[in-house]
Amino acid sequence: MDRIALMNAPGTDWSAWPAPAKLNLFLQITGRRADGYHLLQTVFRLLDWGDTIHLRVRSDGQILRIGESLPGVAEDDDLVIRAARLLQSAAGAAAGAEIRVDKRIPAGGGFGGGSSDAATVLVALNALWGLALTADTLAELGLQLGADVPVFVRGRNAWAEGVGEQLTPIALPEAAYLLVDPGVHVPTPVLFRSQELTRDAAPAKITDFASGSLLDNAFEPVLRRREPAVEAVFQALSRVGTPRLTGSGSGCFVEFATRAAAEQALAQLPGSLRAWVVEGAAHSPLLDARDAMKV
């Protein structure tokens, strides 16, 4: 994805905003809260690739979806519509918006597409509607939409705990990633019910991650046994590096020091695989777009 800031097409009042994908560089489950939500630890890595959200402000207060970003998802269930309505209600905003999504991030792959799209709508409409809500407030609203939304609102690579909302910014080295979408989706609640899932990992520290001792994803063994397509991707990627799972899957990735190395690895994969080479971002391009509105 180009690192676009705010981009206005000539002769229109539409604006385009980036919604970057993410990777979980590791993920472990350390317990469960009294309300049933699982506690986890992970590192979120933002990428320079993702969706684009197109927005046009309306004066009549209506929130409308233009096109169908996710086939089969009703407008009222679409996270971008829910995000806009939530912000409108929380801020008492009179304005509305038309929303169109250019999807690149595979749905249900653990790359954060839905959460990132929702975060971009919150951040962008906060600017376009002139609301001036703080990042803390937007992150709190985002948490009502999903545990991953706050990290996209804040726009920084982060060590995450709790249900994923307790974020500590973390500096990560430059890296390129070979991503593969196996094309299968298992709902996260189904995976959480699996008897094979490790739910009591010993809590780790950021220093453990920095030492390179944390690479595993708790969902990986469950998915590899359950889904032949995921196992096949792991086998293919193991020929070019150390494959890992992102989120609760089914997206897989291998990290490389350079884009050239990742491109070379991509050339060795079967042409039938849906794969991309992307780079890690030091911060979200959404922050650049937001800051451009202040100039």
UniProtKB/Swiss-Prot annotation:
This protein's record includes keyword Transcription regulation: no
GO molecular function, one term: ATP binding
A Pfam family: GHMP_kinases_C
Catalytic activity: 4-CDP-2-C-methyl-D-erythritol + ATP = 4-CDP-2-C-methyl-D-erythritol 2-phosphate + ADP + H(+)
Pathway: Isoprenoid biosynthesis; isopentenyl diphosphate biosynthesis via DXP pathway; isopentenyl diphosphate from 1-deoxy-D-xylulose 5-phosphate: step 3/6
Residue positions of the active site: 22, 148
Enzyme class: transferase
UniProt keyword annotations, A-Z: ATP-binding, Isoprene biosynthesis, Kinase, Nucleotide-binding, Transferase
Residues holding ATP: 106-116
The family this protein is said to belong to: Belongs to the GHMP kinase family. IspE subfamily.
Functional description taken from the UniProt entry: Catalyzes the phosphorylation of the position 2 hydroxy group of 4-diphosphocytidyl-2C-methyl-D-erythritol.
Protein name: 4-diphosphocytidyl-2-C-methyl-D-erythritol kinase
Organism (species): Xanthomonas oryzae pv. oryzae (strain KACC10331 / KXO85)
